[in-house]
Amino acid sequence: SETVVILGSGISGLTHVQLSKNIGSKVISTDVSKYRLEQAKKFGADHSYHAGDLNSDEIRKINNNRLADKVIVCTVNDSAIKSSFNYVEKRGAILFFAVPAENISIPSNHLWRKEISIFFSYGATPDDIKETIKLAEEKKIDFNNMITHSFPLSKIIEGFKLVSEAKESMKVVVTGT
């Protein structure tokens, strides 16, 4: 089976944890939030690390002396983006799922020598949306348990405050009541 490192354990990261587990991958997740690391484990990550604690030696240690087959970047954090290039095995792949900064430094010789493929994701096609709905209906992706808080419209300010603090919440929903 493949090993996938997911950098960032927000909603996108948790979705990728579940997708990766669905195809039998070993999943290593990172984040700077202890709460989000706990969520990553809850959603199926085999290993969760504070972003500052994961390095290529640690990946090799828990992965039979190999780096990751795939790295999925679900954060805009510059150091995570830079680290992604060091976490991937020869002929592996990196997916930038989060929007990177306008200019990122890419170690082209390193990528060339290791024959690493880089992919970017932007938006979703109608077919992607249909597939996502199907996966949710089949209970292969659990979006409902990503909703950690719900606020009535009258408390929308409280909801936005919770989101902006980005502490112990994942997805916050505002209802029309």
Model-predicted regions and their roles:
Residues 30-32, 74, 122:
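N-terminal Rossmann-fold cofactor-binding loop
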Residues 14, 112-115, 140-141:
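Short glycine/proline- and charge-enriched loop/turn segments
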Residues 97-101, 121-124, 147, 151:
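Short strand-turn motif at the edge of the Rossmann-like AdoMet-binding core
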Residues 3, 38, 43-119, 157:
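Glycine-rich cofactor phosphate-binding loops and adjacent beta1-alpha1 units
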Residues 1-53:
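Mid-domain Rossmann-like dinucleotide-binding core that forms the NAD(H)/NADP(H) cofactor-binding site
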Residues 82, 126-177:
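C-terminal hydrophobic helical "lid"/dimerization subdomain
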Residues 21, 112, 137:
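Anion (oxyanion) recognition and catalysis
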Residues 12, 16, 36, 59, ...:
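Aromatic/hydrophobic pocket-lining residues that form π-stacking "cages" and hydrophobic walls in ligand
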